[in-house]
Amino acid sequence: MTQTRKPRSDRPEVGPFVHNDLAREIERLKTEPAWHDGDRNAITLTKRVGLTLVLTVLRQGAVLREHRAPTGVALHVISGRMVLRVGDQSLELGPGEVVTMEPGLAHAGEARADTAFLLTLVEDSSR
């Protein structure tokens, strides 16, 4: 089985501070084979102890199956529209809207339009 690795970006993921231009990164994600050949693409912008930032783009109709994150989560929609299902609640989210979730909370989603969102994963250091 052949494994495809994403090309290394010119952008650092760690350091005393990291700067990202989200609009530029979204455009970059949409030029990669994962976007052209599938319904989504993502890149980890920052990963350090206790904090991970992941920028994700979804094509209209892309489904995020129900899953649970072991960390606290903040999902910030940058562009597009998506439905987020948490338990028996369904939220329609658009640009500028943010949802936070506690660790272990089951959730699922679907893109209603081509959508970009920033996912922030935060580990509780007191656990």
Provide a role label for each language-model segment.
Residues 88-103:
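Short acidic-glycine-tyrosine-enriched beta hairpin
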Residues 37-39, 52-69:
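Conserved short histidine dyad/triad with adjacent acidic residue
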Residues 81-83, 90, 106, 116:
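Structural motif
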Residues 64-66, 84-85, 101, 106-112:
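Short beta-strand His + acidic residue motifs that chelate non-heme Fe in jelly-roll/DSBH
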Residues 60, 71-87:
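Glycine- and acidic-residue-biased ligand/ion/polar-headgroup-sensing regions
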Residues 1-50:
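A short, N-terminal "cap"/entry segment at the start of jelly-roll beta-barrel domains
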Residues 103-127:
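Ligand-binding loop in jelly-roll beta-barrel domains
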Residues 55, 78-79, 94-95, 113:
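A cytosolic small-molecule/anion-sensing beta-strand core signal
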